[in-house]
Regions:
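Macromolecular interaction modules
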Residues: 1-100
Length: 100
């Protein structure tokens, strides 16, 4: 069963700075994760229900949870995790979804 990692980001204090860093630094690091089957990311266009705090969403698909775990434990995963902690530690929620 495929495993999908979602990263959902709250609105940052500096949206333009966030987008610049995400697109030029973080997305390339995430794209280098071993075993990554598909990767997409985009700004949240509209909040239908809730407080409207969500700003950006990333979706990373892996063959299964083992592949996801291996990717996160890899050197590339460590680089991406360190970068995430630097620029979005207090902004991000991470979720894993099993997807057939």
């Amino acid at each position: 069963m495929a495993a999908v990692l979602y990263a959902l980001y709250r609105r940052p204090p500096d949206p333009a700075g966030f987008l610049d860093h995400y697109r030029s630094v973080h997305a390339p690091l995430a794209a280098d994760l071993p075993g990554l089957v598909a990767f997409s990311h985009a700004p949240v266009a509209q909040s239908i229900l809730g407080r409207g705090e969500w700003f950006y969403l990333a979706r990373m698909r892996f063959a299964d949870r083992e592949a996801l775990s291996a990717a996160l434990a890899s050197p590339e995963g460590s680089l991406a995790a360190r970068d995430l902690a630097r620029f979005a530690r207090d902004l991000v929620e991470l979720f894993v979804v099993d997807d057939d």
